[in-house]
UniProtKB/Swiss-Prot annotation:
This is Neuromedin-U receptor 2. The keyword DNA-binding does not apply. It comes from the Eukaryota. Belongs to the G-protein coupled receptor 1 family. The lineage of its organism: Eukaryota, Metazoa, Chordata, Craniata, Vertebrata. Glycans are attached at N9, N27, N194. GO terms for molecular function: G protein-coupled receptor activity; GTP binding; intracellularly calcium-gated chloride channel activity; neuromedin U binding; neuromedin U receptor activity; neuropeptide receptor activity. Predominantly expressed in the CNS, particularly in the medulla oblongata, pontine reticular formation, spinal cord, and thalamus. High level in testis whereas lower levels are present in a variety of peripheral tissues including the gastrointestinal tract, genitourinary tract, liver, pancreas, adrenal gland, thyroid gland, lung, trachea, spleen and thymus. One of its GO terms (biological process) is regulation of smooth muscle contraction.
Length: 415
């Protein structure tokens, strides 16, 4: 992706290896620019843009809903959900700032119009959100590991304040580790053989020796993908063994632990989240490592790189849009909270466009069922209490309490 210091028109790599005498056949500045930088507009602009539009819409709406659900509903403010909130913020930054910039650069690859500051910001943004995403995924996996294998320690240590401190460290480290790659980028200008500046040739690219860039990419791919994915895989394997052991003990003793189905549900959701994350980010890191390891480019290698480059971009942005869908499909609590937020917006819209509607018709009926843990929402049913609310989940429940809330929205005289 262009947002990931990659060039949208990788075909120029092979073109640059042509003999210098070819340059004398170039009859215009535009032809000379195309020779140096590749086509001004990517050949993939139209099909990729068509794919990006639904990803953008679904991703922005979904991640905004995730943020609203966690911010507005006290019952959703759990340590685990705070890490998911961090992931949603990271995804929103990618979709709102990164995707439009990449689409623009595919439409007009040069000149880069935002100057050195814009170049630094673009590089730092993508590096930071990449690192913050994988660190958030790793942190929530460690939290679940502690909750499953050391539940008493988790009850004492897993607090919202601690989660916020950890997230501060995560984002601080992400910004810090983005600096090396950012520092080697800048605006590059091209010149005619006589030394005069080629108009409109400014590009945001690597301006330091390529071996530095290659080294940074290889180190960060190991530290922020291969190593975390290995650690996460080991953690989920150990969690699976523990849950299997607990199930066997319960079968032997004839006791059913009501928390086990809930933990299994949450672990299933987080496991799917990690699996999708790993699959979607694999092409991105393959793309980066491909570019960093190849020293002698050929036409066939450039063609393969172009294909990998486009696929990696689609999967990268897809990972930012799919998380809210996973929450909605695998977590009844998130599903109910999403419906509650949407109903709240629907109620406000009705209030503005139909002010004569009686207030009683704009209430949301909430059925509260107290259960095991705020993020663990599948298990036996408990007696329920019904009450009338406007739009918020009950605020009296603490993160250590275990509750379950189902929501049903009613409009009594539907128009």
């Amino acid at each position: 992706m262009s947002g990931m210091e990659k060039l949208q028109n990788a075909s120029w790599i092979y073109q640059q290896k042509l003999e210098d005498p070819f340059q004398k056949h170039l009859n215009s500045t535009e032809e000379y620019l195309a020779f140096l930088c590749g086509p001004r507009r990517s050949h993939f602009f139209l099909p990729v843009s068509v794919v990006y539009v639904p990803i953008f819409v679904v991703g922005v709406i979904g991640n905004v809903l995730v943020c609203l659900v966690i911010l507005q509903h006290q019952a959703m403010k759990t340590p685990t959900n705070y890490y998911l909130f961090s992931l949603a913020v990271s995804d929103l930054l990618v979709l709102l700032l990164g995707m439009p910039l990449e689409v623009y650069e595919m439409w007009r690859n040069y000149p880069f119009l935002f100057g050195p500051v814009g170049c630094y910001f673009k590089t730092a943004l993508f590096e930071t959100v990449c690192f913050a995403s994988i660190l958030s995924i790793t942190t929530v996996s460690v939290e679940r590991y502690v909750a499953i294998l050391h539940p008493f320690r988790a009850k004492l240590q897993s607090t919202r304040r601690r989660a916020l401190r950890i997230l501060g460290i995560v984002w601080g480290f992400s910004v810090l580790f983005s600096l090396p790659n950012t520092s080697i980028h800048g605006i590059k200008f091209h010149y005619f053989p006589n030394g005069s500046l080629v108009p409109g040739s400014a590009t945001c690219t690597v301006i330091k020796p390529m071996w530095i860039y290659n080294f940074i990419i290889q180190v960060t791919s190991f530290l922020f993908y291969l190593l975390p994915m290995t650690v996460i895989s080991v953690l989920y394997y150990l969690m699976a063994l523990r849950l299997k052991k607990d199930k066997s003990l319960e079968a032997d003793e004839g006791n059913a632990n009501i928390q086990r189905p809930c933990r299994k549900s949450v672990n299933k959701m987080l496991f799917v989240l990690v699996l999708v994350f790993a699959i979607c980010w694999a092409p991105f890191h393959i793309d980066r490592l491909f570019f960093s390891f190849v020293e002698e480019w050929s036409e066939s290698l450039a063609a393969v790189f172009n294909l990998v480059h486009v696929v990696s971009g689609v999967f990268f942005y897809l990972s930012s849009a799919v998380n809210p869908i996973i929450y909605n499909l695998l977590s009844r609590r998130f599903q109910a909270a999403f419906q509650n937020v949407i109903s709240s917006f629907h109620k406000q819209w009705h209030s503005q466009h139909d002010p004569q509607l009686p207030p009683a018709q704009r209430n949301i009926f909430l059925t509260e069922c107290h259960f095991v843990e705020l993020t663990e929402d599948i298990g036996p049913q408990f007696p329920c209490q019904s009450s009338m609310h406007n739009s918020h989940l009950p605020a009296a429940l603490s993160s250590e309490q275990m509750s379950r809330t189902n929501y049903q929205s009613f409009h009594f005289n539907k128009t």
